[in-house]
Protein backbone atom coordinates (compact mmCIF):
# COMPACT_ATOMS: atom_id res chain seq x y z
CA UNK A 1 0.00 0.00 0.00
CA UNK A 2 1.31 3.45 -0.86
CA UNK A 3 1.17 6.24 1.73
CA UNK A 4 2.33 9.86 1.86
CA UNK A 5 4.49 10.61 4.90
CA UNK A 6 3.29 13.57 6.95
CA UNK A 7 6.16 13.46 9.45
CA UNK A 8 9.85 12.66 8.96
CA UNK A 9 10.97 9.34 10.38
CA UNK A 10 12.53 5.99 9.61
CA UNK A 11 10.58 5.58 6.39
CA UNK A 12 11.65 8.87 4.82
CA UNK A 13 11.15 12.60 4.95
CA UNK A 14 7.91 14.56 4.93
CA UNK A 15 6.11 14.35 1.58
CA UNK A 16 7.73 11.10 0.42
CA UNK A 17 5.46 8.46 -1.09
CA UNK A 18 6.48 5.05 0.27
CA UNK A 19 5.25 1.47 0.01
CA UNK A 20 4.32 -0.19 3.31
CA UNK A 21 2.32 -3.24 4.29
CA UNK A 22 -1.43 -2.52 4.41
CA UNK A 23 -1.78 -3.50 8.07
CA UNK A 24 1.08 -1.21 9.14
CA UNK A 25 -0.55 1.68 7.26
CA UNK A 26 -4.11 1.01 8.49
CA UNK A 27 -3.27 0.18 12.11
CA UNK A 28 -0.35 2.48 12.90
CA UNK A 29 0.72 5.10 10.37
CA UNK A 30 -2.68 6.55 9.43
CA UNK A 31 -4.25 6.54 12.95
CA UNK A 32 -1.12 8.14 14.45
CA UNK A 33 -1.15 10.88 11.81
CA UNK A 34 2.27 9.85 10.50
CA UNK A 35 0.99 9.14 6.99
CA UNK A 36 -2.02 9.54 4.72
CA UNK A 37 -3.24 7.21 1.98
CA UNK A 38 -1.74 8.03 -1.43
CA UNK A 39 -5.02 8.88 -3.17
CA UNK A 40 -5.29 11.20 -6.17
CA UNK A 41 -6.68 14.07 -4.09
CA UNK A 42 -3.98 13.65 -1.42
CA UNK A 43 -1.31 13.65 -4.15
CA UNK A 44 -2.68 16.93 -5.57
CA UNK A 45 -2.66 18.46 -2.10
CA UNK A 46 0.91 17.26 -1.58
CA UNK A 47 2.03 18.79 -4.89
CA UNK A 48 0.42 22.11 -3.96
CA UNK A 49 2.17 22.05 -0.58
CA UNK A 50 5.51 21.27 -2.22
CA UNK A 51 5.09 24.22 -4.63
CA UNK A 52 4.14 26.55 -1.76
CA UNK A 53 7.13 25.35 0.30
CA UNK A 54 9.48 25.96 -2.66
CA UNK A 55 8.15 29.49 -3.13
CA UNK A 56 8.58 30.18 0.59
CA UNK A 57 12.17 28.89 0.50
CA UNK A 58 12.93 31.07 -2.53
CA UNK A 59 11.50 34.12 -0.71
CA UNK A 60 13.58 33.34 2.39
CA UNK A 61 16.72 32.95 0.27
CA UNK A 62 16.05 36.26 -1.51
CA UNK A 63 15.60 37.99 1.86
CA UNK A 64 18.84 36.41 3.09
CA UNK A 65 20.72 37.59 -0.01
CA UNK A 66 19.31 41.11 0.48
CA UNK A 67 20.51 41.07 4.09
CA UNK A 68 23.89 39.78 2.90
CA UNK A 69 24.26 42.69 0.49
CA UNK A 70 23.47 45.17 3.29
CA UNK A 71 25.69 43.45 5.89
CA UNK A 72 28.64 42.98 3.53
CA UNK A 73 31.72 44.67 4.97
CA UNK A 74 30.09 45.64 8.27
CA UNK A 75 32.43 45.59 11.25
CA UNK A 76 30.83 45.02 14.63
CA UNK A 77 32.59 47.05 17.32
CA UNK A 78 32.13 46.27 21.00
CA UNK A 79 33.51 48.17 23.99
CA UNK A 80 33.91 45.93 27.01
CA UNK A 81 35.42 46.25 30.45
CA UNK A 82 38.93 44.85 30.36
CA UNK A 83 42.16 44.67 32.26
CA UNK A 84 45.59 43.89 30.76
CA UNK A 85 44.26 42.62 27.42
CA UNK A 86 41.75 40.23 28.97
CA UNK A 87 38.10 41.14 29.23
CA UNK A 88 35.88 40.53 32.23
CA UNK A 89 33.51 37.76 31.18
CA UNK A 90 33.16 36.97 27.48
CA UNK A 91 31.60 38.40 24.35
CA UNK A 92 28.51 36.33 23.58
CA UNK A 93 26.28 35.85 20.56
CA UNK A 94 23.69 38.06 22.27
CA UNK A 95 26.24 40.90 22.59
CA UNK A 96 26.96 40.73 18.86
CA UNK A 97 23.22 40.60 18.05
CA UNK A 98 22.61 43.68 20.24
CA UNK A 99 25.42 45.57 18.50
CA UNK A 100 23.98 44.68 15.08
CA UNK A 101 20.53 45.76 16.30
CA UNK A 102 21.96 49.17 17.22
CA UNK A 103 23.34 49.40 13.67
CA UNK A 104 19.83 48.77 12.32
CA UNK A 105 20.02 45.06 11.47
CA UNK A 106 17.45 42.72 13.01
CA UNK A 107 19.26 39.38 13.36
CA UNK A 108 18.69 36.14 15.24
CA UNK A 109 21.48 35.58 17.77
CA UNK A 110 21.31 31.80 17.29
CA UNK A 111 22.49 32.17 13.70
CA UNK A 112 25.68 34.03 14.59
CA UNK A 113 28.72 31.79 14.25
CA UNK A 114 31.75 32.61 16.35
CA UNK A 115 34.81 30.36 15.94
CA UNK A 116 35.73 30.41 19.62
CA UNK A 117 34.90 32.09 22.89
CA UNK A 118 35.96 35.72 22.74
CA UNK A 119 37.75 36.55 26.00
CA UNK A 120 40.48 38.86 24.76
CA UNK A 121 40.67 42.25 23.13
CA UNK A 122 41.26 42.03 19.39
CA UNK A 123 39.77 41.41 15.97
CA UNK A 124 37.84 38.25 15.15
CA UNK A 125 36.20 36.75 12.06
CA UNK A 126 32.57 35.86 12.64
CA UNK A 127 29.71 34.88 10.33
CA UNK A 128 25.94 35.15 10.21
CA UNK A 129 24.09 32.22 8.65
CA UNK A 130 21.04 33.98 7.22
CA UNK A 131 19.97 30.91 5.22
CA UNK A 132 21.42 27.41 4.81
CA UNK A 133 22.93 28.57 1.50
CA UNK A 134 23.83 32.16 2.51
CA UNK A 135 26.58 32.85 5.04
CA UNK A 136 27.65 36.44 5.67
CA UNK A 137 31.24 36.96 6.88
CA UNK A 138 31.84 39.88 9.26
CA UNK A 139 34.55 41.31 11.50
CA UNK A 140 34.17 41.61 15.26
CA UNK A 141 36.37 44.26 16.86
CA UNK A 142 36.58 44.10 20.65
CA UNK A 143 38.27 46.97 22.44
CA UNK A 144 38.59 48.12 26.04
CA UNK A 145 36.04 50.50 27.47
CA UNK A 146 37.42 53.89 28.38
From Swiss-Prot:
Record keywords: Ribonucleoprotein, Ribosomal protein, RNA-binding, rRNA-binding
Keyword check for Ribonucleoprotein: yes
Protein's UniProt keywords contain Ribosomal protein: yes
Molecular-function annotations in GO: rRNA binding; structural constituent of ribosome
GO cellular component: ribonucleoprotein complex; ribosome
GO terms for biological process, alphabetical: translation
Superkingdom as given in the UniProt entry: Bacteria
Family: Belongs to the bacterial ribosomal protein bL9 family.
Known role: Binds to the 23S rRNA.
Protein known as: Large ribosomal subunit protein bL9
Highest classification ranks of the organism: Bacteria, Thermotogati, Deinococcota, Deinococci, Deinococcales
Protein encoded by which gene: rplI
Amino acid sequence: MQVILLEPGRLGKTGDVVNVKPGYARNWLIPQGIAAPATASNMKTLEAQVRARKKQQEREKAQAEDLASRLNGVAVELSVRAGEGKIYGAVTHADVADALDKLGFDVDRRRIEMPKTVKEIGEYDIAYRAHPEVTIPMKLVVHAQK
